[in-house]
Amino acid sequence: MVNKEQFYDQIRKALEDGNTRYYRNLIYIERDDYFDHVKEIISLFLNFKSNPSVAYGFVPWASGSKERMRTIKEYFSKFDDIDYANAEYYLGNTYDLVILDTVDNFQPINIGRLVDLARGGGLIIIYTNNLIKDKTFRTSIMRNGLILDEYEKRFKRKLYEHEGIFIIDVNEYIPKPFSGNTMPKAEKKVPRNPLMPKEIHELSLSEDQNRVIESFTYLLSGGQRALVLTAARGRGKSAATGLSIAGLIEKLRERKEKSIRIIVTAPSIASASQVMSFAKLGLEALGEELSVKVSDTGHIKSLRGDYFKLEYVPPDAAIEDEGELLIIDEAAALGINYIDLALRAWKKVALVTTVHGYEGSNKAFLRYLRRLIESKRIRVKWVNMEQPLRYAKGDPIEKWLYDALLLDAEPSEPQYLNDTMIYEDVDKSELANDDNRLRAIYGIMVTAHYKNNPDDLMIMLDGIHHKIKAIRIGENSYIAACQIAEEGELSDNMVDIALKGGTFDGDLIPDRIIKHVRIKDFAKLRGWRIVRIAVAPELQDKGFGSELLKMIYEEARDKGVDWVGSSFMSDQKVLNFWIKNGFIPVHISPKKNEKLGDYPVVVIRPISDIATKIVKISAYMLKEKLLNTLHDVYFNMNPEVVRLMLTSTKIVSKTINVSPIILDKTISFLQGVSPYESSADGIHMLTLKYFWDGERDWSLTQDEELVLIAKVLQGKPWSYVSTVLSSNRTHIYELIYSAISKLMKKYYNLTADSKVGLTLKDVMNSQQYD
């Protein structure tokens, strides 16, 4: 144990060493007189660095928070006060000092985002009066006023375990200076005979970036090609991508006489801002005179020169756009379905994404992506960046952050596959205190999802209504894991809130059913929502996920639960997994999730009689909503997902009557007399009849169903439908003809050889014109 003076002296030495070796230090303060210590640490840091750049994270609307911020701001001339809710807009910045006020809220995503903004030689200060008491995010996880604190206990334990961290708590000062090794600071290394312009290479900050810039020339060669660039946060991938675009424009100019067009897309224009900014920097270094268009939010929208245009285009529009190259930044956030369409529509594609880190896609995305590209037989180059730019490799705070937030969790390899499978109800307190088990179970969960959030672990460990189920083989070899949230049994007041459009934390599935199906009885039922279910990568597609789901369903039934359900992004493969296990789609959001790039879906497998009745009604309402609004609300929904939704709700049906006039016009279409455009109303009616028919024991081919959905129900352009089916307009037309021929024959025994023309009596006898 040391006294305050000795403690501060060790901090001074650590700051000097950190500056020399380009690593960061962190000070954690948790005590009632926290603010006095914060001010003392700031004074100490100012003696070390007189005019630092500062990022200050806080909750501006909380009582007293602005006063604390203003007091601290007086110490500095370069000061960014950052509302945690808007932290993503500062992710490209770097600071000497990062201060995180966690008095009002302790939330892992805020720690993950802002700690990484500190540069080597810099300092991070995290301060609070109490890590658990009166915290906004913790309150949102509570159920019936109850919550655990397993996550916070583990977080504090990790502070004590790692180096480069100095702790001021209620009773003592605990210095943990860094004694490890770091790699030298990243430096550029311009290739001796570069393929890209030397001016572009000179703008890089690391040898890693130089390597990436050269790698982008892979896209200049013939045939369909993709480049996949992955990196943890802080490696400079967006900067390298932007500089590479500038270099490619210069190389393309040497080859092409016509104007060059390159499209950049991302979940938002803000997400693409770094790519566009560094492309501008690179083009200016090449001596280009640029016309720059900026969005209302201040982000670069397009760069135009005499012979080229570089433009940000929203994801859906980018699919149908044209140009030499499509750049997809933060590709994992847009999902595999989107990338599939992009690879069908574009000849040259660069996919850039974060792996690991607080917003990383982890290995699941890369695994799905590798399968997708292999199935298309596209030439691909995989490039990974490892050298951090903001700080030295070996930085102790990065090591602590990844461990504390489990940003690099990976499952262990399964052992003892010949042993008996054991279904386990996992004790969360034991799990939080056993890093090997926690990494094994949580690692399985995160590797199965494209996009992960550090908050997920806190919700799982602290939520008293969140349970963990797993299958293990032997003593400690986990092969499948599941996180369950208990939902339902809502009060009348919560039901009224939902019916009036209000929202509340938790109870996701009851909320959606109340809002969209309007049946209040569902709110009183007990349900288990499966938040995540996953299988170790080596054992996927072998039935273990279905086996775990079966065990969970049987346990729920035995405990008197009314339903088991789940909500997830509308990925075709994931949706198919739930459907084949007896789950019924009951809701799809009318809006895309902007961060995850797809439409959230709700599926339920009912247990009780009342749940079964409500689920059937919900499935009917969903089918009606889809078939009535695919041309509008769900115009951008993947047709393959629509097909699964429609064909999996055959438990509900409705009779669609088609008039003799419509049928007669459709015969003319089959005879080649009436073109598609003139017969579209009849084709549309027959399509509705087919998808509403829950009693048929036959089906069209998958391609025929897809073309009816994309062209007839969604009203997509011929070019888009051709892209979806990797075909051409002639073949698409033939598929429509084939499908309508079958429907006319099956339902009405009519063919292209049937007679055309009606009498008034024929029409009046149909009883549709009385």
UniProtKB/Swiss-Prot annotation:
PROSITE patterns reported in the protein's UniProt record: GNAT
Annotated compartments: Cytoplasm
InterPro entries attached to this UniProt entry: Acyl_CoA_acyltransferase, GNAT_dom, NAT10/TcmA_helicase, P-loop_NTPase, TmcA/NAT10/Kre33, TmcA_N, tRNA_acetyltr_TmcA
CDD domains named among the record's database cross-references: NAT_SF
Gene Ontology CC annotations of this record: cytoplasm
Pfam family, one: TmcA_N
Annotated acetyl-CoA binding sites: I533, A534, V535
UniProt keyword terms in alphabetical order: Acyltransferase, ATP-binding, Cytoplasm, Nucleotide-binding, RNA-binding, rRNA processing, rRNA-binding, Transferase, tRNA processing, tRNA-binding
Catalysis performed (reactions): cytidine(34) in elongator tRNA(Met) + acetyl-CoA + ATP + H2O = N(4)-acetylcytidine(34) in elongator tRNA(Met) + ADP + phosphate + CoA + H(+); a cytidine in RNA + acetyl-CoA + ATP + H2O = an N(4)-acetylcytidine in RNA + ADP + phosphate + CoA + H(+); a cytidine in tRNA + acetyl-CoA + ATP + H2O = an N(4)-acetylcytidine in tRNA + ADP + phosphate + CoA + H(+); a cytidine in mRNA + acetyl-CoA + ATP + H2O = an N(4)-acetylcytidine in mRNA + ADP + phosphate + CoA + H(+)
EC supergroup of this enzyme: transferase
Any one biological process term the GO annotation gives: tRNA acetylation
Organism domain of life: Archaea
Binding site for ATP: Q209, R390
Job description of the protein: Catalyzes the formation of N(4)-acetylcytidine (ac(4)C) at the wobble position of tRNA(Met), by using acetyl-CoA as an acetyl donor and ATP (or GTP).
Protein family according to the UniProt entry: Belongs to the TmcA family.
Protein name (database record): tRNA(Met) cytidine acetyltransferase TmcA 2
Organism of origin: Saccharolobus solfataricus (strain ATCC 35092 / DSM 1617 / JCM 11322 / P2)
